[in-house]
Amino acid sequence: MRKAAFHNLGCKVNSYETEAMQQLLEDAGYEIVPFREGADVYIINTCSVTNVADRKSRQMLHRAKKMNPSAAVVAVGCYVQAAGAELKKDEAVDLIVGNNQKKDLVQILDDYFADHENSGEILDIGHSQEYEELHIRRIADHTRAFIKVQDGCNQFCSYCIIPYTRGRVRSRRPEDIEHEVRGIAEVGYKEIVLTGIHLSSYGVDFKDEQKENLLTLIKRLDQIPGIERLRLGSLEPRIVTREFAKELARLRTICPHFHLSLQSGCDATLKRMNRRYNAAEYQACCEILREEFDNPAITTDVIVGFPGETEEEFAETERFLKAIHFYEMHIFKYSRRAGTRAADMPDQVPEGTKSVRSDILLALEKQQSLEYRGRFLGTEEEILLEEPIEIDGTKYMMGHTRQYVKGAVPYEEGLKNKTVKGIFTKALNEEVLLLEKE
């Protein structure tokens, strides 16, 4: 029996695909072992979203070869699409597997072990491709399952390489998604998170008569017994209409936790980024969600130091973030990415300036996050318990509310994957609130 070890880099879509590839190899008779252990095959699911991600991908490939020089080292995913020619010349890499070829991993390995040749022909991901069918029966996290529902992106934001590494939008058939989620529910998962490269585009590639979109998919999954919570991955603001929000608010399982990608609060910067909305339109989306849901958690991403971002443009973004008041913000310093339009733009911002701006927004994020959590003190809430933690020497069982606020109860055996209700009485630290059970 051959041993295989996996290492995942990057987003939740990659995590889903890594789980699916592990299960493919298990079904083919491989033993899956931890990455640090000796293996016959090392599979690194790479990321290429930034130059740093490229470097980490190369480092992990070389680390695997050093761990066992006789093992087959397999590079999979986005970095393969971005730098396949370079990887073919890398002596640490034995096999390359592009996006939309992961379902064929077992056959690719069989062929390799038969003749020890790297046949890695990378598909042109930019050409029209069908959705690559990968499936899972379980997830390493035993309370929350990430479900991939689409791949690819048609947006071509000026800073982003992903449309070139993932290709155009390809949506998964809704009946296939439903079948997988029913299976996940049957083995005990209570929460699912719908994820994709551009989740809001789900269904745009279907023929008109199919009339499937993200909202119809959510309604379908809302009916599945055993699923108590349905959480959405990152959304484009333009999907949030009054009708969309009203329909979601009627559903049994939907979590009032919305990650709306912003990137900048300045219209001039948004235009250079090729984001297809302005700050006022984004704010209107947030207002709709707050009118249709009780105290929803709204989170976002912000890029500082985008080419041409002046002090006034940054100040405009800062004012906008203060006005919206997010639960959490992921702050990124712009990373120049070869192959994107932004990499060749004039007025690149110095790294020192990016760091100063990042620090300012991180401080704002911390303040706003504390204020949002504080609203829950004294309120009755429900948390889905996930894992044991220790705070100041005391052991607790920690989970999340539907808004993704962390809560904890005193530790007891057998609480994992249980839902408990109670009152949040105090903060145990900056991130976790204490729930006194009913």
Language-model features: where?
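Flexible glycine-/small-residue-rich
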Residues: N8, G196, S234, L262-S264, ...
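Hydrophobic, well-ordered secondary-structure elements that form the walls
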Residues: L260, D301, L321, M329, ...
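Proteins enriched for Cys/Gly/acidic motifs involved in redox and nucleic-acid/cofactor modification
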Residues: M1-G203, N213, E243, L248, ...
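Terminal RNA-binding accessory module
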Residues: D344-E438
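Contiguous mid-protein beta-loop-alpha structural module that forms a pocket-lining wall or clamp
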Residues: E309, I324-F326
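Conserved strand-turn element in the central/C-terminal portion of the radical SAM core barrel
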Residues: F156, C160-G167, R229-R238, S264-R275, ...
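Radical SAM/AdoMet-radical enzyme domain recognition
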Residues: E186, L215-T216, R220-R229, T241-T300
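Short, solvent-exposed loop/turn segments at secondary-structure boundaries
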Residues: A53-R55, R168-R173, G203-E209, R272-R275, ...
